[in-house]
Amino acid sequence: MFKTLYSRIAIYAITVILFSALMSFLFTNIYYHFHLKASNDAKIMRTLKEAREYERTQKPKPLDTYLKHLGQMNYQIMTVNEHGTKHFYGETFRKNTISQSAIKKVLNGEDYHGIKNKPYAFFVTGFFDNETDNTVGIQFKTDDGALAVFMRPDIGETFSEFRIFLAVLITLLLIISISLVIASTYSIIKPVTALKNATTRIMKGDFSTPIKQTRHDEIGTLQSRFNTMRQNLGQVDQMRQHFVQNVSHEVKTPLTHLQRLLTQLELTQNEEEKQLCINEMFEITNQVSELTKELLLLSELDNASHLTFNDNVHLNTLIKDIIRHEQFRTDEKDLVMFTELEDLYFRGNERLLHQAFNNLIINAMNYAPQNSMINITLTSTNHLIIFNIENDGSIAEEDAKHIFDRFYKLSDESSSNGLGLAITQSIIHLHHGSITLTSDDKTQFIVKLFI
């Protein structure tokens, strides 16, 4: 029954309507029994006593005619004389349920309050009980002796047209309410169904179809955020495909080269050529090894929840150690290194920060022209550490836009795999810092870390 949200909401709403109607009836019934019943009894008793007083003072002849007249005025009347003979006036009672003891008490002059004392029942409204015990009774004195007179208003006659009106009203109320519930439920479910279908398309890899925002409530917000999510997932999927293609290319190229070298090694008889092949093979395996390490590091950075950033890193020492370790690169190109480093500490992940600064320094060494200078400064301002590395040579504007993209290379001849600066940017962002590039006559990377 509840396999769809549509049926669930519709049935819930209809159940609420019916339950509300039932509870309203029960509470109305309780209100009648505990509040209105005594008042109704007293009002009818007063009317009956006024009728008795009128009969006693005015002496309408005969009494039977007078009672018939009362019956025609929408009252139901039953009389019982001392011999137990009963007469009925007005609309006939549905049941004759009054007890003999009640009749005797009235004949003896005691008032009868059957309406007031009607037993309470949950699903029976005493006001409409057309029974002789649901009356008030008093004694009339006649020439033939005492006469017990029991009376109640003829509810059926009084409210016959109203009951038809009420029945039509309730029927129409239920029909219209249920119809509107079904229609409104459909209006709620329709965009949800559209979301479900769109989700199915996304599961199949289709990120191109947006859903129209048709509302301005919570569902409208959900539609808007779904479209945003769809776009983001599409971008992630494109990045994933691009990443797989790049990795495949970066791995396939050295493997193809390695296969060619193995074939050449197998065929050549020249020892010098064999050694050159072996040396080149070692270089290729080192490149693949570096690529693997950087891919693993990227994966670690993309899932950084396990990383800690509690090391007290001495940046001055860290940068000097990198420069000292890479001294051979400066010697190969006759580079001059100028450093101006403040004695600064920063709380973060020392291993990752070492990798980030190492990438920037090696990148400057690799792309600086022969016999040029590299300037490195480390300064601080209020709550900010600024690392600046500058080398001669510029980067084209189009290249600068993609310099931090994964696998982006400035030149196809470059031995780099294009991951170093992407890794550096990820590390700096994980430390809540920023990295920017400016390139005119010189190329300058600026890293800002908040203390």
From Swiss-Prot:
Its EC number is 2.7.13.3. The modification Phosphohistidine is found at H249. One of its GO terms (molecular function) is ATP binding. It catalyses: ATP + protein L-histidine = ADP + protein N-phospho-L-histidine. It is a multi-pass membrane protein. Its main location: membrane. SMART domains: HAMP, HATPase_c, HisKA. This is Heme sensor protein HssS. The gene is hssS.
